Each structure stands twice: as C-alpha cells, then as structure tokens.
C-alpha cells in the first residue's frame, strides 16, 4: 500500500493524480437496505480521474417471502396446492408440490430424489394408445406415423382389388387353356401380396417399438405418501432460522 499527498473523504476514493495505477476499493452498498443488511458488494475503481463501479456479488438477504415454504420445482407457495416433504431433504429443498413431483418423476423416468436419493413409493400406470396416436413424440415420428397410416389405408384396398383381379384373370385363362398367362398372373398376385405383407410387418414392428418406448417413458406416476408429510402454510422455512453474517464493509486497496 502506497501513500501520497492526497485528500481522503469518507467512502470516496483517493484523488491521486500522480499514481498511474488504478486504485480499487470494494464496499458494500448501503443505499438499499433490507432489514438493515446491505444487498450487494460493489467494486469501485479510479482510472485517469474517472470512477468505475462494478457489482462484484450480491448478498443473501432475508425477506418476508423467504419465511414461507415454497415448492423447489415451481417456486410457488401453498396457495394453489398443499406442500409436501416426501423425502429426506431439508430447508427450502424439502418442500414440493405433489403434482410437480409426479410430473418430474414421469418426465425423468425415475423413482428417487436426485438430491438425497430417497426412493419414493409410486404407482405407475401406462397411458392409453389414443394419447400416443395424438402425440407420438418428436416431429419426424409424427410424420412417419401419419405417412404410414395414409399408405396403409390407401395400399390395403388397392392390393386387395389388384389381387382379386389377377386371380379372376388367372381363372379365365385356365378355362381357355392359357396356362402360361394364368401362371404369370398367379405369380404376380403372390409377389404383390408378399411385398404388401412385408411392408406392413416392418412398419407395424417399427411403430410397436416406438409405442413401447413411449409407453415405458411416459407413464402416469401416482405418488403414494402418508398424509403426515403435509407442510402447513404457516410453518416458517429453515431459511429464516439462519442469519446472514456478513461484514458491514470490505475494503481492498
């Protein structure tokens, strides 16, 4: 630390015109207080006769909203839905809405807490087939399902009519002793139905695999918990029990 002939005022940086190096001072801004506590630490530097200020970090402050428990997923209180404490987490991470937890367990396809690894008692129910037909997943899977359904509805009657006409032609040729033409029409009918059945089988297996995967990862989760885990809305959270211990001022020169 160097000294020079400079005038010092409270909370004002030294006015040193002879020093070329910038002077840095870190103070806690007390202009905006919450319950007598500063809200953030501001770094003030002087360079070329100009003051430059930067917020270094914010300080944890207590507010009336922190005294009420809230859901750790949606950060909402218990006004719309009761809060639960179904796992071993404590403090602000220990309360959660039942619907939020069930939605998270369904989306993540897990049955335990990601923080304390407590395993929940859940009941999983598969979703109906109609819901998968409405929303099978990504956009390319929707296009594939829609295209295959249209092709199936269009090709099935076309293949049936074509096969029937070929067989009728083969029977007529047999009556007129045209065995070569009859054999050709029968072979064409067999090839037509073979290609149709092969395409139908491959498409059906592909969509069955997608449906089974969707059904496994998109189950309806029902949380099985006792009623004793409900958290009253007037119970203060553990965050309000811990006081914020900060120095009133930090100075670095």
From Swiss-Prot:
GO terms for cellular component: early endosome membrane; endosome; intracellular membrane-bounded organelle; lysosome. Zn(2+) 2 binds at residues 87, 89, 113, 116. Its EC number is 2.3.2.27. It catalyses: S-ubiquitinyl-[E2 ubiquitin-conjugating enzyme]-L-cysteine + [acceptor protein]-L-lysine = [E2 ubiquitin-conjugating enzyme]-L-cysteine + N(6)-ubiquitinyl-[acceptor protein]-L-lysine. GO terms for biological process: endocytosis; protein ubiquitination. The modification Phosphoserine is found at residues 237, 243. A zinc finger (RING-CH-type) spans 63-123. Pathway: Protein modification; protein ubiquitination. One of its GO terms (molecular function) is zinc ion binding. It is found in: Cytoplasmic vesicle membrane; Early endosome membrane. The RING-CH-type zinc finger domain is required for E3 ligase activity. Interacts with MARCHF2 and STX6. E3 ubiquitin-protein ligase which may be involved in endosomal trafficking. E3 ubiquitin ligases accept ubiquitin from an E2 ubiquitin-conjugating enzyme in the form of a thioester and then directly transfer the ubiquitin to targeted substrates. This is E3 ubiquitin-protein ligase MARCHF3. It comes from Homo sapiens (Human). The gene is MARCHF3.
């Amino acid at each position: 630390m160097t000294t020079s002939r400079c005038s010092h005022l409270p909370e004002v940086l030294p006015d040193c015109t002879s020093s070329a190096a910038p002077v840095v001072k870190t103070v806690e801004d007390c202009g905006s207080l919450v319950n007598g506590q500063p809200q953030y630490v501001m770094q003030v530097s002087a360079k070329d006769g100009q003051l430059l200020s930067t917020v270094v970090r914010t300080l944890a402050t207590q507010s009336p909203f922190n005294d009420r428990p809230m859901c750790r997923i949606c950060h909402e209180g218990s006004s719309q839905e009761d809060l639960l404490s179904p796992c071993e987490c404590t403090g602000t991470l220990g309360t959660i809405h039942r619907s939020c937890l069930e939605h998270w367990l369904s989306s993540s396809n897990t049955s335990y807490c990601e923080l304390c690894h407590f395993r929940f008692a859940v009941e999983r129910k598969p979703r109906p087939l109609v819901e998968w037909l409405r929303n099978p997943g990504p956009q390319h899977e929707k296009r594939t399902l829609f295209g295959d359904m249209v092709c199936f509805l269009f090709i099935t009657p076309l293949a049936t009519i074509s096969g029937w006409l070929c067989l009728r032609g083969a029977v007529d040729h047999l009556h007129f002793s045209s065995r070569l033409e009859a054999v050709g029409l029968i072979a064409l009918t067999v090839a037509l139905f073979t290609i149709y059945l092969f395409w139908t089988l491959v498409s059906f297996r592909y969509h069955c695999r997608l449906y089974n995967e969707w059904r496994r990862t998109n189950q309806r989760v029902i949380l099985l918990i006792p009623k004793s885990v409900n958290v009253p809305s007037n119970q203060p959270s553990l965050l309000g029990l811990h006081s914020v211990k900060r120095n009133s001022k930090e100075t670095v020169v």
